[in-house]
């Protein structure tokens, strides 16, 4: 747990009592602060109370007595419709911030480095890889933010340690003063536009990661898209080191990095390499870490190979760009896709359709995806269990070398699952069930 006792904030409201909110409330309470914690969901309030959080109804709070509102990132405060509690907080002049902002303030001036990683796609892999490289080299490191535990539940680090935070656009909006020793923007493509009032708001939230940096700190940016190229051109005008990353020239040998397939992972690796070099690691130590990286669940996770058919869990691919990264890695694909679609659907994936032997469509997007796929062989399966069963049967009948049953939905999961992790776990469970009747 992060020590917040030195914070000048005396009374803090916490809205949203999931993982990060509970961690924030407990850290603030442990620091002797007055905490008013609330969640609109009664079940979340009960679970938080059982964890030791003091519950107070923020709908009737006296906001003149509250210094700051620590807001869970999933709660809207501007677009599309702000939560009523955030409206009251703003009207009272209360500062809105996040648990990640509180962490940044707590370690300021203590000789602990802070790395932040954002981007529409690739954040989690880059964060996990960076943490792995640093730990493999013997650097005291904690990773968190949007990945793993809440920021304030991370372990304290000694001088010279490194916190590596994965940050979403939602989280960056709630970090008004944080400055990062190494700030990374991997890429930008349209996503979460309703929460940011359009593309301009989304880009502005991502760009916030570079705010306030000064000489001696490092900015790392991918330049595969027009938005990032424009940001990089602006960053060139500052007196801060800027590193442009190129997936075609990642900087070290990735041939033995088996958990990092594809061009998109070359970009993730290039970013992690740039981060570690900025923090003083030798290339030999970085290379050893690349080769030993085990990968992440739900990100092109190879689950099993049955009867010559490989099953890949890429449930984290919640938009077309992410799914395209996976589709570009394999030649004979039995593709499971669908869920709650993002703007544009899968139109941008047409270049990969020749690789798709058959597509199995699930969830709300199935009919729209069917129209886009056109003459590409496909069927509407409805649910994941049916899709896995049908994909495996077809792949076995076809007998193609290198056949892959790929769950890379290009959609959010919320029509059938609470999150992408549950969707991916169900896929893994279904593959395990197939093992009973299939030769390895």
List the model feature ranges, each with a label:
Residues 11, 64, 73, 77-223, ...:
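Phosphate-binding loop of NTP-binding sites
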Residues 39-44, 58-59, 101, 148, ...:
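Short, polar loop motifs at secondary-structure junctions
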Residues 2-11, 23-31, 140, 258-356, ...:
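Nucleotide phosphate-binding/pyrophosphate-handling subdomain across enzymes
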Residues 33-40, 219-223, 336-337, 354-365:
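Short internal beta-strands
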Residues 34-39, 142-143, 164, 244, ...:
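Short beta-strand "acidic-cap" motif of Rossmann-like dinucleotide-binding folds
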Residues 85, 346-403, 438-440:
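C-terminal helical cap/extension that packs against the catalytic core
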Residues 28, 69, 117, 146, ...:
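Residue-level signal for inorganic ion chemistry
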Residues 1-98, 102, 261, 281, ...:
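N-terminal leader/targeting and accessory segments in enzymes
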């Amino acid at each position: 747990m992060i020590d917040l006792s030195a914070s000048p904030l005396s009374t803090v409201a916490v809205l949203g009592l999931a993982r990060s909110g509970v961690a924030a409330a407990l850290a603030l309470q442990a620091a002797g602060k007055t905490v008013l914690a609330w969640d609109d969901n009664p079940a979340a309030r009960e679970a938080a109370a059982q964890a030791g959080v003091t519950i107070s109804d923020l709908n009737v709070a006296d906001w003149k007595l509250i210094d700051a509102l620590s807001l869970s990132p999933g709660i809207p405060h501007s677009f599309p419709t702000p939560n009523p509690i955030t409206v009251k907080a703003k009207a009272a002049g209360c500062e809105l911030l996040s648990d990640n902002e509180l962490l940044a303030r707590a370690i300021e001036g203590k000789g602990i480095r802070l790395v932040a990683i954002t981007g529409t796609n690739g954040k989690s892999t880059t964060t996990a890889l960076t943490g792995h490289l640093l730990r493999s080299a013997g650097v005291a490191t904690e990773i968190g933010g949007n990945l793993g535990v809440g920021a304030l539940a991370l372990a304290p680090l000694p001088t010279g340690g490194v916190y590596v935070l994965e940050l979403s656009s939602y989280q960056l909006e709630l970090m008004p003063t944080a400055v990062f020793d190494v700030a990374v923007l991997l890429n930008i493509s349209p996503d979460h536009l309703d929460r940011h009032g359009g593309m301009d708001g989304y880009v502005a939230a991502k760009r916030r990661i570079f705010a306030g940096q000064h000489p001696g700190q490092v900015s790392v940016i991918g330049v595969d898209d027009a938005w990032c190229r424009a940001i990089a051109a602006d960053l060139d005008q500052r007196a801060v080191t800027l590193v442009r990353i190129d997936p075609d020239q990642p900087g070290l040998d990735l041939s033995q990095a088996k958990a990092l397939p594809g061009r998109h992972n070359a970009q993730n690796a290039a970013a992690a390499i740039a981060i570690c070099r900025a923090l003083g690691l030798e290339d030999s130590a970085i290379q050893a870490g690349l080769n030993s990286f085990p990968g992440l669940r739900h990100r092109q996770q190879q689950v099993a190979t049955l009867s010559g058919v490989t099953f890949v869990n890429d449930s984290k691919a919640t938009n077309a760009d992410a799914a395209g990264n996976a589709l570009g890695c394999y030649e004979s694909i039995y593709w499971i896709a669908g869920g709650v679609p993002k703007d544009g659907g899968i139109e941008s994936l047409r270049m990969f359709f020749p690789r798709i032997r058959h597509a199995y469509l699930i969830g709300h997007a199935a009919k729209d995806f069917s129209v886009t796929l056109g003459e590409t062989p496909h069927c509407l399966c409805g649910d994941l269990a049916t899709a896995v069963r049908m994909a495996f049967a077809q792949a076995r009948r076809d007998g193609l070398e290198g056949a892959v049953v790929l769950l890379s939905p290009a959609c959010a999961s919320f029509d059938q699952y609470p999150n992408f992790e549950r969707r991916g776990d169900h896929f893994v469970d279904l593959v395990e069930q197939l093992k009973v009747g299939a030769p390895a």
